[in-house]
């Protein structure tokens, strides 16, 4: 009896496996794409949670180590530099040695991959981006985790595609976009912003059709569910419930948008210019590049010890600044300090994003503007926090040129949907002036520079073979 049961079970198992293989091998099967998109979303969500916990673990141990010697002033300063320098050097070395495409934000790499202009080598990008990001973000460098999550999410999508042997180009494109959107959603607990980011920021690369958009929706839903299982459903940035902006104050938000419209292109020029400076300093030499990264990381460690608000990604700073706990002068000082540290950290090629630092910069300048307006117009009883929220999305809109994503992202992260009108006005003003001043979207410009460098290297190799 048992000898008959075992073969019968095996036959049934083989039949199920054959049905699954047949389903997955059918070309242009929407159900298959949606199933793979679901798996991509789950894996991207798990990667997002793991990355967040890993960075927090490294940061906590670094701070705990410094606390052990807090009673010895000279030693705590020395160790603050050394701990952060060593962590940063790990990140820089991993990128330079094993996966150069994992440096920086990673979002331009995904944009290039969607156009089949940049390769996706998930087997090396995923570990390098994860552990390299643990080093640089754990060191206290002014970087965010959203860029790494977008790149890791996109690479997870390609990994799923390769595992299940889907050779068609449309499936490759769809799962890459799905993973990127799921990664952003998992980084910020912002599902709608993840969807809009693909549609708006990657509008020139994304193939918008019914199947692809359903896949993006599915992946984002799954990654957000995974995020909320581990982290709960509360907003990522808790600034409290702010009051709505009266109609007669809306012109102030337009003025704030104009300010950010001037700041955005200037910020982009600083980033791109500093990238050129760093390229000239290290000249492609790995040792110089890693030592330079260690010096920047160590400086961030010292800065975090002296003024914690000036270092780190900035998520912890945003609620404090929005609550009006700083003076206008202090807000402007921290803003300038963080502009410098953001530009240095991001332009150096460290594995880390720039979304979170830009959100913090927008909060600082917006809060300073709001406090100044509250002093100028005391009869209106203005709340500086509303300007801080508007500023969060405005710098993103002016720099990245994705105003809708900036608006929705901030509203989802802060749970202040009643501020949608002042947010729209501020982001529109910022985008229009940035465009009028000739500013180019940051990620598109970085991608163009990467492609130009790639073409120059290919040409040099071709010339070398011909000689």
UniProtKB/Swiss-Prot annotation:
GO cellular component terms?
Answer: plasma membrane
InterPro entries recorded: Cl-channel_ClcA (IPR023861), Cl-channel_core (IPR014743), ClC (IPR001807)
**Positions occupied by motif Selectivity filter part_3:** 353-357
**Periplasmic topology ranges:** 68-74, 140-145, 231-250, 308-327, 375-384
| UniProt keyword Ion transport present | yes
Intramembrane extents: 107-114, 175-187, 191-199, 385-399, 400-402, 403-414, 415-419
Q: Which residues lie on this side of the membrane: Cytoplasmic?
A: 1-30, 99-106, 115-121, 165-174, 200-212, 280-285, 348-352, 437-467
Q: Where in the cell is it found?
A: Cell inner membrane
Q: Where is this motif: Selectivity filter part_2?
A: 144-148
What reaction is this protein's catalytic activity? 2 chloride(in) + H(+)(out) = 2 chloride(out) + H(+)(in)
Q: Give site residues, Mediates proton transfer from the outer aqueous phase to the interior of the protein.
A: 146
Q: How does it sit in the membrane?
A: Multi-pass membrane protein
**Binding of chloride, residues:** 105, 354-355, 443
Q: Which GO terms describe its molecular function?
A: antiporter activity; voltage-gated chloride channel activity
Instruction: List where the protein spans the membrane.
Output: 31-67, 75-98, 122-139, 146-164, 213-230, 251-279, 286-307, 328-347, 353-374, 420-436
What is an example of a Pfam family matching this protein?
Answer: Voltage_CLC
**Residues flagged as site, Mediates proton transfer from the protein to the inner aqueous phase:** 201
Subunit relationships: Homodimer.
Q: Any idea what this protein is called? A: H(+)/Cl(-) exchange transporter ClcA
- Organism from which the protein derives: Cronobacter sakazakii (strain ATCC BAA-894) (Enterobacter sakazakii)
Lineage of this protein's species? Bacteria, Pseudomonadati, Pseudomonadota, Gammaproteobacteria, Enterobacterales
């Amino acid at each position: 009896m048992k000898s008959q049961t075992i073969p019968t079970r095996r036959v049934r198992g083989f039949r199920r496996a054959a049905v699954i293989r047949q389903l997955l091998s059918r070309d242009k099967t929407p159900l298959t794409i949606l199933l793979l998109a679901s798996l991509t979303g789950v894996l991207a969500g798990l990667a997002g949670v793991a990355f967040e916990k890993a960075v927090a673990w490294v940061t906590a141990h670094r701070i705990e180590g410094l606390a052990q010697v807090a009673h010895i002033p000279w030693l705590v300063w020395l160790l603050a530099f050394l701990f952060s320098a060593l962590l940063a050097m790990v990140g820089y070395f991993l990128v330079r040695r094993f996966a150069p495409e994992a440096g920086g934000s990673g979002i331009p790499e995904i944009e290039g991959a969607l156009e089949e202009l940049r390769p996706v080598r998930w087997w090396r990008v995923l570990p390098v981006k994860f552990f390299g990001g643990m080093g640089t973000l754990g060191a206290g460098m002014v970087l965010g985790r959203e860029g790494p999550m977008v790149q890791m999410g996109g690479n997870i999508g390609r990994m799923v595609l390769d595992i299940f042997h889907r050779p068609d180009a449309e499936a490759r494109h769809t799962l890459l976009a799905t993973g990127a959107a799921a990664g952003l959603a998992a980084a910020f607990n912002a599902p709608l912003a993840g969807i809009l980011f693909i549609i708006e920021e990657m509008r020139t690369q994304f193939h918008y059709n019914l199947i692809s958009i359903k896949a993006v929706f599915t992946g984002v839903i799954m990654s957000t569910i995974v995020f909320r299982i581990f982290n709960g459903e509360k907003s990522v940035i808790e600034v409290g419930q702010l009051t709505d902006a009266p109609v007669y104050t809306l012109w102030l938000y337009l003025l704030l948008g104009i300010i950010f419209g001037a700041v955005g292109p200037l910020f982009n020029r600083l980033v791109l210019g500093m990238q050129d400076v760093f390229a000239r300093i290290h000249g492609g030499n790995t040792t110089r590049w890693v030592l330079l990264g260690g010096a920047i990381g160590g400086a961030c460690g010292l800065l975090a010890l002296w003024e914690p608000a000036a270092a780190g990604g900035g998520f912890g700073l945003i609620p404090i600044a929005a609550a009006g706990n700083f003076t206008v002068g202090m807000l402007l000082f921290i803003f300038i300090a963080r502009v410098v540290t953001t530009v240095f950290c991001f332009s150096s090629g460290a594995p880390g994003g720039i979304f979170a630092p830009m959100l913090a910069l927008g909060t600082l300048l917006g809060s300073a503007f709001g406090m100044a307006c509250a002093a100028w117009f005391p009869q209106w009883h203005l709340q500086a926090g509303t300007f801080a929220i508007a500023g969060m999305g405005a710098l993103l809109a002016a720099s990245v040129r994705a105003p809708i994503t900036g608006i929705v992202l901030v509203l989802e992260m802060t749970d202040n949907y009643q501020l949608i009108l002042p947010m729209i006005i501020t982001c529109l003003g910022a985008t229009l002036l940035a465009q009028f001043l000739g500013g180019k979207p940051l990620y598109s410009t970085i991608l163009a520079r990467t492609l130009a460098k790639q073409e120059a290297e290919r040409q040099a190799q071709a010339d070398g073979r011909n000689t």
